[in-house]
Amino acid sequence: QGRPPRPHIPP
């Protein structure tokens, strides 16, 4: 499988 999705980091 590919890499897991990155968590959303707000600006």
From Swiss-Prot:
Record's keyword terms, sorted: Hypotensive agent, Metalloenzyme inhibitor, Metalloprotease inhibitor, Protease inhibitor, Pyrrolidone carboxylic acid, Secreted, Toxin
Tissue specificity: Expressed by the venom gland.
One GO term of the biological process aspect: regulation of blood pressure
GO MF terms held by the record: peptidase inhibitor activity; toxin activity
Keyword Repeat set for record: no
Pyrrolidone carboxylic acid: residues carrying this PTM: Q1
Any one GO CC term of the record: extracellular region
Location of this chain's protein in the cell: Secreted
Described function: This peptide both inhibits the activity of the angiotensin-converting enzyme (ACE) and enhances the action of bradykinin by inhibiting the peptidases that inactivate it. It acts as an indirect hypotensive agent.
Family statement drawn from the similarity comment of this UniProt entry: Belongs to the bradykinin-potentiating peptide family.
Protein name: Bradykinin-potentiating peptide 2
Annotated source species: Gloydius halys
